Regions:
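An aromatic- and glycine-enriched ligand-binding surface/loop that stacks and positions planar moieties
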Residues: 21-85, 200, 204, 212-401
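Flexible, polar/acidic helix-loop-strand segments at domain edges
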Residues: 92-93, 308, 357-454, 584
Length: 585
């Protein structure tokens, strides 16, 4: 269980230092600006506070960019109950209440301020250069990632690059992306050429995120930065970018980084696609009809390290209702099966709030393009084939479909020691004991499997896209049991990304950077859904998907609290009544 506890221990170390509250950004900044950090241990403790921001956002996942990216894409609808208007608003590119995502906005800036604290303090310490470089590289990666999410979510976000609490205002909408790319370039240069084995960021994770950020920025802003440019249907990606320090980052530089990641990261594709997902864990696999008897084995069984993971969020058994809710995987909870029905009805998928029903258009498109692709059944549960499944949730389920995303789901297992014969999560059986904080059999706090944000298959597909060759695509297809393709095409690459990475949070920014979002979203109109358990149709709201995308370019509403402070202007498309979601019916 060492892997599961490492970040908690480090975060607790931060909390104990000088009685500093890790949630108080100003105190962290003041402490470090004079004499802290001094030792390697001090620096690692501050860095743990930067990492802890990953889990802080997991406490309220429904307000995060990752959650929005799932529901806003053409692969998922909103879901949730009639009172969960935020979920439906995310899908419809609408808003619900004044500060729908303000918790996320403020949390990410806290993480950025912690990173800034460490970045500013490190040059003045007496640590050896290798230690400084490692800490600096990780801090720059995390700052870049936090800005990546903010800039993807809101567009023109203020840039804070030094610790402090004074008000900062917006610059140019492209400025955040240039800083993101520069931070990631620096992280690649600073981090040692060695694979991390303890869950920390390494050089290769930085190369992978550099590829992702480059592909988004160069594609999305390829036509310019006005609303018309960003919503244009012309795909004309940039080939070079001038960075804030006056240097230039080219497409060839990014290819070099991705090639290095592929060749030297020590990552590899897992032999069987199903083994990536928690439903093949040893406590569940032989009781699930889809997986039993096939030799599947989850790569994270008993806290093992996933050889395909480059960047993930870790969780542990110390989640509680106070400040540590985010130590549990609350994305799993939110994407769990709605309705509180018996675990046997939905086995092996556990309970939750019903976010992100899979859009029928994804299943239809996939079956038409690749009828023999085993990844489809590995990724999506068809409830129409499960006689025990009961539709409607708590008689309130909105935008329910026949399809359920398996990848991020809570997973149960059989347990003869319990009255109903099932543990609410397999983790209760795999990791017995020491559930002293959350308590055992707590369906809201016992999901602790990793949330993988970047995996090696994504890097292979980025390599193919950047180099316009089929090598990476065909390696991914080979694992899926599919025939190789003979020649590279944008259509083949885009399809392969959609199938391989379905329901993993990457599709939304792919649609935006390829300038195909409006057309793709429109396919969700008219698909079959259920409303409170009764057959219904997914109908346009607030003008429809195309109108809302073209009005906003996919950026969310700036929280009104931030607008009132005078630090940001409201984004286009969010000032009229047509942006406010009033409910499904």
């Amino acid at each position: 269980m060492k892997k599961l506890n490492i970040f908690l221990a480090s975060a607790m170390a931060v909390l104990s230092l000088a009685s500093c509250d890790i949630n108080d950004v100003q105190n962290v900044g003041e402490l470090s600006s004079s004499t802290f950090p001094v030792s390697k241990e001090d620096g690692e403790a501050v860095l743990a506070g930067v990492y802890q921001n990953l889990n802080q956002v997991c406490a309220d996942p429904q307000m995060s960019f990752l959650y929005y990216a799932q529901l806003a894409s053409d692969d998922m609808l909103g879901g949730g109950g009639v009172n969960d208007k935020l979920m439906q608003a995310d899908d419809l590119l609408c808003n619900y209440n004044a500060d729908m995502t303000n918790v996320f906005y403020e949390a990410r800036y806290k993480g950025i301020n912690r990173a800034n604290t460490l970045i500013e303090a490190l040059p003045n310490t007496s640590m050896n250069e290798d230690t400084k470089n490692s800490l600096m590289g990780q801090a720059k990666f995390l700052r870049a990632f936090y800005y990546y999410e903010l800039a993807s979510m809101y567009g023109n976000v203020p840039m804070r690059l030094k610790p402090g609490s004074e008000a900062i205002t917006q610059g140019n909408i492209e400025d955040p992306w240039k800083q993101i790319l520069m931070d990631l370039r620096d992280a690649v240069d600073l981090l040692p050429a060695a694979k991390s084995t303890d869950g920390h960021i390494d050089k290769y994770a930085a190369e992978a995120l550099l590829g992702r950020a480059w592909l988004f920025y160069s594609g999305f802003f390829g036509n310019g930065s006005t609303l018309a440019d960003l919503t244009s249907t012309t795909y004309n990606p940039l080939t070079s970018v001038e960075l804030p320090d006056g240097t230039t980052l080219s497409k060839e530089n990014v290819i070099t980084a991705i090639d290095d990641c592929v060749a030297n990261s020590g990552r590899k594709l897992v032999d069987k696609y199903q083994n990536l997902w928690a439903y093949t864990n040893r406590c569940t696999v032989e009781d699930y009809d889809y997986t039993k008897g096939q030799g599947f084995k989850w790569v994270e069984d008993d806290a093992s390290q996933n050889p395909e993971t480059l960047f993930s969020i870790k969780f542990n058994k110390y989640a509680d209702w106070g400040t540590t809710i985010g130590y549990a995987n609350n994305y799993a909870l939110h994407f769990g099966v709605r309705g509180g029905q018996a675990y046997g009805n939905t086995f092996p998928f556990g309970q939750g709030w019903g976010a992100g029903p899979v859009a029928p258009n994804l299943v239809k498109d996939w079956a038409a393009a690749e009828p023999n692709d085993a990844r489809r059944d590995a990724s999506i549960q068809d409830w129409s084939k499960v006689a025990t499944y009961k539709k409607g949730g708590w008689s309130d389920f909105v935008q329910e479909t026949d399809y359920y995303a398996k990848k991020w789901a809570p997973v149960t297992c059989k347990n003869d020691q319990l009255k109903d014969g099932y543990s609410c999560t397999f983790e209760n059986v795999m990791y017995p004991g020491n559930w002293d904080v959350a308590g055992k059999e707590n369906m809201q706090l016992n999901n602790i499997h990793d949330l993988v944000l970047i995996r090696f298959a994504d890097v292979l597909l980025m390599q193919s896209e950047l180099k316009k060759d089929v090598a990476g695509i065909n390696e991914v297809r080979k694992r899926a049991g599919l025939n190789p393709i003979a020649a590279y095409s944008e259509e083949a690459l885009r399809n392969e990304r959609r199938w391989e990475l379905a329901c993993e949070g990457t599709r939304w920014n792919d649609l935006r950077r390829w300038h195909i979002a409006a057309a793709a979203l429109e396919k969700q109109n008219g698909v079959a859904i259920y409303y409170c358990g009764q057959p219904d149709t997914n109908t346009p709201h607030n003008g429809g998907y195309t109108a809302r995308y073209n009005a906003t370019a996919g950026f969310q509403k700036m929280p009104e609290t931030q607008v009132a402070l005078g630090t940001v202007k409201q984004n286009e498309g969010w000032t009229g009544a047509d942006s406010e979601y009033q409910g499904w019916k």
